[in-house]
């Protein structure tokens, strides 16, 4: 039987679930909570693929229903609630960051119901400022457009809400795919060593030698502008860094005594990597995902700002910045609001990433 150990002692104050709090009833609810999280994650991802219209509608409703159920269960279940409260007391900035991310995801899920207007609709405001004929460049506080309208009369608030859908989807999909691929390659490279490890590291060095935005621009020029191509380009950028970090951690773990003992008795290498090394790099995997999420959102916004990201007509925070750039002197709100949205999400994921790193890495506890 495989034995899973960690080489560090977990901090009792930050223990996720204490055994005393788990009763037969709560264990069933915990299983239901876990299933709800999984259902929401899957439906959230699939809902952005643009499948058959009726199926897309069903999947979106599943995501909309599972999100509040998940949040209610998190508040009701004592083990989950106590863990969140401990995290809030110990890492308040990280907890605030988590709230901002949840709000951003909720904005994405309920965008069609929260946004006051169609993001591409024109002439939605009634303003005396700006151009009252075409109703463009209406300032913030305008009736029908609380954050104003843009250069062709579209509601800035509605475009900001729908822009969260693209930014969060691209960011989350990128880190999920990129960090997962990097983890698999990093563990395999560290454990195998030899020629395979050398080849992987040379490829990693070559890809990391390019500035990220330059590499992304080159890939988008080759692939063409689309949401999925943006995800592919960002995955290519993230995989080398994730591979290097996970490989470094896996090299340390594979020299632990119990893993050396497993190897000495002829345990299957794949089994060792999956049952012994992988569980010990999960903490690093989670921290990498949160830290790189902000980076992915910024790069996606940069590509949209440069006009090579998502197709024209799809509202994104980056494309809103590009539109506002030409009118920044007189209509500054066109860049202020999307800029605030990007900054808020990036700061939130960085705060959350730092907090999770401090919690999950025993070497950093107490700082």
Where are these regions (language model features)?
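Gly/Trp-centered helix-boundary motif
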Residues: 1-179, 183, 187, 296, ...
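Alpha-helical transmembrane segments of integral membrane proteins
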Residues: 152-367
């Amino acid at each position: 039987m495989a034995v899973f150990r960690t080489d560090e002692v977990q901090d009792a104050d930050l223990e996720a679930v204490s055994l005393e709090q788990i009763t037969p009833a709560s264990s069933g609810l915990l299983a239901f909570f876990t299933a709800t999280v999984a259902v929401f994650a899957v439906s959230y991802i699939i809902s952005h693929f643009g499948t058959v219209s009726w199926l897309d509608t069903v999947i979106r409703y599943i995501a909309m229903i599972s999100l509040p159920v998940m949040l209610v269960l998190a508040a009701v279940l004592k083990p989950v609630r106590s863990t969140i409260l401990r995290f809030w007391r110990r890492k308040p900035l990280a907890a605030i960051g988590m709230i901002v991310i949840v709000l951003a995801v909720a904005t994405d899920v309920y965008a069609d119901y929260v946004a006051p207007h169609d993001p591409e609709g024109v002439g939605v405001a009634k303003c005396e400022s700006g151009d009252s004929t075409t109703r463009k460049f209406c300032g913030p506080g305008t009736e029908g457009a609380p954050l104003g309208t843009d250069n062709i009369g579209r509601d800035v608030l509605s475009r900001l809400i729908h822009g969260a859908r693209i930014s969060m989807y691209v960011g989350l999909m990128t880190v999920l795919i990129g960090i997962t691929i990097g983890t698999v390659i990093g563990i395999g490279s560290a454990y195998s060593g030899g020629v395979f490890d050398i080849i992987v590291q040379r490829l990693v060095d070559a890809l990391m030698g390019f500035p990220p935005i330059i590499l992304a621009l080159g890939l988008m020029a080759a692939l063409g502008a689309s949401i999925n191509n943006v995800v592919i380009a960002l995955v290519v950028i993230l995989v080398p860094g994730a591979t290097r970090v996970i490989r470094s951690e896996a090299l340390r773990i594979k020299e632990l005594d119990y893993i050396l003992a497993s190897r000495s008795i002829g345990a299957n290498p794949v089994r060792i990597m999956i049952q012994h090394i992988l569980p010990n790099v999960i903490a690093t995997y989670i921290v990498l995902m949160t830290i790189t999420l902000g980076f992915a959102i910024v790069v996606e916004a940069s590509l949209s700002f440069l006009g090579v990201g998502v197709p024209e007509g799809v509202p994104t925070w980056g494309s809103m910045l590009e539109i506002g750039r030409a009118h920044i002197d007189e209509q500054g709100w066109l860049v202020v609001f999307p800029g605030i949205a990007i900054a808020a999400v990036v700061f939130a994921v960085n705060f959350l990433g730092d907090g999770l790193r401090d919690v999950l890495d025993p070497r950093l506890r107490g700082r």
